[in-house]
Amino acid sequence: EKILIDHHQEPQKEVFAYGISNTEKSSTCEMVYDFIVESGNSNKLNTTIAQCLYTGVMTDTGSFRFPITSAAVHKMVAHLKELGLQHSIIHDNIYDNFLESRLRFTGFVLLNRMDVLYEYNTAIMSISKRDLQEFNIKTGDTEGLVNYLLTIEGIKFAAIVIDREEERKWSFRSKGNFDVNIFARKHFEGGGHINAAGGRSSDTLNNTTAKFYEVIKEYQQQLQ
């Protein structure tokens, strides 16, 4: 039987025998930690488990800077530290361990593929297969790229579409109360959270990008 532990909006609960979904939690790893503690199994937590739980929480909270990061999250991390967690090593392995080609790719797409739509407080980036091949970029190397767009002053909505072999993959991020989960579900067969979601398209890169430019017009007032 399948058991669901999830923090996304509208999970497919019907395919699980048991489960819980809590969108107020920062991550599934926080929920797993709560389950271990509340079931009276805190004594089974060790350094290896602590590393896994910390990794999930750190990445899902944007290194603890997203609004979903609660006091409970910090208390959890404090407990994991008491178990011997070396958090800086995990951070270095995930965020400070990239190949030179990835950094050059990031600079290239920020310079050549980013479009800032100030009338919608939105930034979008469209990345082709050729771009990926030129820098030998693999799946996962584009993780977090969408967050760069939100560092622009005044930008409330960021979107990246990447031309993968099987389909076009969208990543959406937002600030404030603009719900990218609703946006992704309505327009790009996706979903996720209020401020972070994903989507997909079986259309061409040019066509799905053009669709974004068209539908964003519906949200100008919300994004002011």
What are these regions (language model features)?
Residues E1, V15-A17, L53, Y120-N121, ...:
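Short coil/turn connectors at secondary-structure junctions
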Residues E1-D6, D34, R200:
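Short intrinsically disordered, low-complexity coil segments enriched in acidic
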Residues G62-H187, G192-Q224:
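Hydrophobic helix-and-loop "lid/oligomerization" segment in the mid-to-C-terminal part
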